[in-house]
Amino acid sequence: MRLHSRQASNPHRQYSAAQSLHSSSDDSEHKEIPSTMGWAKRLMRWMVTVDQPHTFETSLKNYQSLAHVTNYIFFCGGRLRTVAKTKYLSVLVLVMLIAPIVLFSVFETGYLWKHVAGAKPCVVLCYYFWTLCFASFISTGATDPGTLPRNIHLAQLQDDYKLPLEYYSIITLPSPVANAPVRLKYCTTCRIWRPPRASHCAVCDSCILSFDHHCDWLNNCIGQRNHRYFLAFLFSSVLSSIWLLTCCALKLRHAGSPSAAPVSLLLICYCAVSIWYPLLLAIYHLFLTGTQQTTHEYLKAVDSRNPIFHKVTHPERNPFVTGSCARNMLLLMCQPRGYDFLHTRSEHQAGDWRFFRLPIPHSFEKV
């Protein structure tokens, strides 16, 4: 195998033309303009960073360059992110999270706290799990899922658009589990040999470490760095719905009739309907983690067109299985977050090849 890892400061000579173009672009981007024109634009770009020219800035952060080679939109100086050109269903989920707690705070909390005996612990637990749910929602949908850097393994070729044939092969490595090798594939978009369990997300246009799935409802991938937050979001949303429903039931019983507590009845109906989707999804992921599988691996292993109704079982050749259901759950649910490989809030160095978008290569090497 001809594997050649290239550091950002020392790219291969075959891409010298692209490097010159990028360097000249960086030089033009660093030209200073009058401060009276630049401060407002810098503030706006700090608040929202999208894939657009930034010629008014004298220094860049990595997240500003990352927006050019991925589909990410960054907020608050690279602290939060989402994916561009999607349906933005996460906004709907956010409204569905905030609306019931606002109604509960305005119409229910005061009455329960003052007039219903024994309701105070229920109110406290309701707010606690809602806060946990909201924090998990932000941590899952607006943080780094485990984005891998680009252009780490570039081929030694004289043609800019071709790769050697072995780069299209699958490498098998031994594992502790018999007859279950670890498979590695090369990503022709990101130009890297992907680590085990990593996969390229077409929506985010990035390779994600320990890729589970891309969640349309959260508008982000679920990977190694936010998997625990995703599971916490599912369980806390179920628990917050249970306690909200309990509080409203106490209010309704104390009021005596639905007409005396219409908001309580509305919230009870809302919780009774909305609790099922996160509950079923939480149970589904419990079974997946118990068998040491990600959603991506499970869907690839299922032969049926209806994977929802397919029985979740231990895969025949899983190099990551431990033999214990509890240990499998612990390893996936409590796995280390890992490193931020791109250091998105650090200063951007001109010519850093992790932030290049190279052409898609041809299928065969030059002969």
Swiss-Prot record:
A GO MF label: protein-cysteine S-palmitoyltransferase activity
This protein's record includes keyword Transmembrane: yes
InterPro entries recorded: Palmitoyltrfase_DHHC, PFA4/ZDH16/20/ERF2-like
Membrane topology (Cytoplasmic): 1-87, 143-229, 284-367
GO aspect biological process, one term: protein targeting to membrane
Catalytic activity: L-cysteinyl-[protein] + hexadecanoyl-CoA = S-hexadecanoyl-L-cysteinyl-[protein] + CoA
Pfam families: DHHC (PF01529)
PROSITE patterns membership: DHHC
PTM comment, free text: Autopalmitoylated.
Residues spanning the membrane: 88-108, 122-142, 230-250, 263-283
Keywords: Acyltransferase, Endoplasmic reticulum, Lipoprotein, Membrane, Palmitate, Transferase, Transmembrane, Transmembrane helix
Protein localization: Endoplasmic reticulum membrane
Function of the molecule: The ERF2-ERF4 complex is a palmitoyltransferase specific for Ras proteins.
Entry protein name: Palmitoyltransferase ERF2
Organism field: Eremothecium gossypii (strain ATCC 10895 / CBS 109.51 / FGSC 9923 / NRRL Y-1056)
